[in-house]
């Protein structure tokens, strides 16, 4: 894994958005388009947006698209620890963290203070588990969805 990027000081509010795919990912779909559109429409004079997701073949590890800085590290599994390391190295410069729930989670209640967490539910995935995974992972995923959603009930905000 590449070294941890240190953010430069910036007077703007800094929002770190965590997602398992970004707008350029090979399997990007509606969630990624929606997320990019929301983030790109922020007032970038007041808000610095950093989107963190896994690196994929042909992707730049660091690029800016429509005012959103895209950082890519790790893979579908290691991106969580990469995001955690990035947050820890920059926590004093990050004001809010958006954990996007779209099949994949970043488990921010374990490493981001409650007052900084924003939980964004793009879609619930109970019915997707049988399509995307095989037994026993599919059964485990379906049964853990509701208890795992409860982890975020005390976040600063929950967006659906």
Predicted regions and their residues:
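A short, charged, and often flexible helix/loop element on the N-terminal side
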Residues: 63-91, 132-137
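Local beta-strand N-terminus motif with an aromatic residue
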Residues: 12, 94-95, 154
């Amino acid at each position: 894994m590449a070294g941890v990027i240190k953010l430069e000081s910036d007077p703007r509010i800094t929002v770190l958005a965590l997602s398992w795919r970004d707008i350029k990912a090979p399997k990007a779909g509606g969630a990624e388009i929606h997320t990019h559109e929301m983030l790109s429409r922020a007032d970038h004079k007041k808000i610095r947006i950093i989107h963190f997701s896994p690196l994929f073949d042909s992707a730049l590890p660091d690029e800016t698209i429509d005012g959103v800085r895209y950082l890519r590290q790790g893979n579908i599994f290691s991106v969580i620890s990469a995001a955690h390391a990035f947050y820890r190295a920059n926590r004093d410069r990050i004001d809010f963290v958006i954990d996007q729930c779209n099949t994949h989670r970043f488990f921010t209640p374990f490493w981001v203070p409650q007052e900084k967490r924003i939980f964004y539910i793009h879609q619930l995935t109970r019915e997707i588990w049988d399509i995307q995974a095989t037994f026993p992972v599919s059964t485990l995923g379906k049964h853990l969805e509701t208890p795992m959603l409860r982890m975020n009930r005390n976040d600063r905000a929950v967006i659906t």
